[in-house]
């Protein structure tokens, strides 16, 4: 993406970014309208992260701060958020694997905070982040510093980012017990499959750990993940991410 932009004149590159922005925001709205037509219990959707490409890239971050671009994002993302609220569609985002807030490398933490705040800007444009867990932006603990690293990073996040961040247990180093160290700081997402892969058990609703996870949501209806790796579970013609991208 960056290499393609750098090969173009500024006018061509900026026009391409504009076209992608227009397409991707419209795709968000269309997706939410579809999900809003489903039965109430299915009205939830994870939004793709690439809606505004190169947002945190040093050479191109300026583009997203230009007044006309900001004005378009404010106006059009607001329509997306209004649609979701009107149709009672619960929204979430999940920054990628390179968002490692608990890294022991300060530069990686800095970049991870930038990436999380990019997601928060999109969330803020849609009218969320105003209160605790009106939107879910989920990350794994990751990183060698574990729960302590997450707590340190939380202090550096914007109020809106702290309102929307959730932590999910994973199937490798950081499980439910580690997530629960953060239960007083943020909402926890239980991934049943990750827990099964790591511990070889399915957690039961009667389990005290389950209750503590629910309590971390402070009265908000909790979100939960049940992941699996079978690609054929997706209907034909659907993909995880249909955001517009750059040519080769």
Q: Language-model segments: which ranges?
A:
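Short active-site loop/helix that positions an aromatic residue
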Residues: 196-200
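Conserved, mostly hydrophobic/aromatic
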Residues: 94, 191
